[in-house]
């Protein structure tokens, strides 16, 4: 075999590896505004969220017509918060907005703020453990209607799994 014949497969492998790395480098930072918009889209593709939260959960909106979930990576700081807005539409709990924080005043009886370290979000997104364990051991901190959250543990777990379904760069903090 000639040197040229041996070098072609190596060159092809190097190009393929470079393409994979370039794709990973283009992922938006986990919990950035752009990542949250993609998480909103993924919410709407997840029946356990759209259907199972369409009754009592979504109706508890404080009369404003939507619920807010703000989230951030603790190690990136509270200033990196993003927002999901969930609205009742056509009998479903649909994410109608994902991006930068727009709701300044939250209602703690209706809305949620959740934060965890990047490592913990990644673990929850992989399904290493669910919301009960995450909250019991302080791996997920949240403010909001705790009793309501306890009543929707199945959908809550699916929400945490969104973190693993939406590609995000965990090495960079959102700007």
Walk through the language-model features, giving the residues of each.
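Intrinsically disordered, low-complexity Ser/Thr- and Pro-rich stretches
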Residues: 2-3, 54
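Bacterial N-terminal signal peptides that target proteins for export
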Residues: 3-13
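Signals and flexible motifs at protein termini associated with secretion
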Residues: 4, 22-26
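Bacterial N-terminal signal peptides
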Residues: 12-22
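Feature captures hydrophobic
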Residues: 27-175
């Amino acid at each position: 075999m000639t040197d040229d014949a041996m070098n072609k497969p190596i060159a092809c492998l190097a190009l393929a590896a470079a393409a994979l790395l370039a794709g990973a480098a283009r992922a938006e930072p986990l919990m950035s505004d752009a990542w949250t918009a993609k998480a909103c889209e993924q919410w709407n593709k997840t029946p356990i969220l759209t259907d199972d939260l369409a009754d009592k959960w979504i109706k508890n909106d404080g009369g404003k017509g939507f619920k807010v979930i703000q989230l951030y990576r603790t190690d990136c700081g509270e200033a990196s918060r993003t927002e999901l807005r969930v609205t009742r539409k056509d009998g479903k709990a649909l994410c109608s907005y994902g991006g930068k924080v727009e709701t300044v005043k939250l209602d703690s009886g209706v809305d949620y703020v959740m934060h965890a370290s990047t490592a913990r979000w990644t673990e929850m997104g992989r399904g290493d453990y669910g919301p009960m364990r995450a909250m019991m051991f302080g791996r997920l901190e949240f403010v909001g209607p705790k009793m309501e959250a306890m009543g929707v543990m199945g959908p809550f777990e699916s929400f945490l799994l969104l973190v693993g379904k939406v590609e995000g760069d965990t090495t960079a903090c959102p700007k």
